[in-house]
Amino acid sequence: PGLYWLKDAGRAVGLPVTTEVATTQHVEQALKAGIDVLWIGARTTVNPFSVQPIADALKGVDIPVMVKNPINPDIELWLGALERLNAAGVNKLAAIHRGFTAYKKSRFRNKPNWKIPIELRRRVPSLPIICDPSHIAGTRKLVPEVSQTALDLTFDGLMVESHIDPDVALSDAKQQLKPAELGRML
């Protein structure tokens, strides 16, 4: 029922809704619920044996699909996932830059490593690239800074986490903005 609630919420505010899919069952459920956009998460992108069944499940389906970068800084894995989806006939593709695992303590939760999405843009100029500043920042106070850097680098959009009361969010509470904070940032 969660996907239907999400779809109802989107209708109530007049916005399209998106959700992450990691398996063919997720794809089937999202399509059945009428979800508008799908995304493949960073931990799925790293595994071609996970991406291929998702690509196969999307054959003949006209839905936008966004692909997050893999957790490790490997542009070939990212490109490989995008190419598998494209080969399956998914034409509405976008990439999401969410940063890379930081093996050393850093001010960011995930290292931005901006040169990788810049190289992706060089290789596939027509591919929209969205930035997920929430996952890069890891803390809400850094989200505006990361967002501005992404826009300065001509990213095509932002995927920002927002919650009415982030401190009680069930996941990633530290990186979520309150709606008013999101409004000010935008």
Regions found by a protein language model. Give the residues of each.
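Alpha-helix-loop-beta-strand connector modules within alpha/beta enzyme cores
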Residues: 1-19, 54-64, 114-129, 175-186
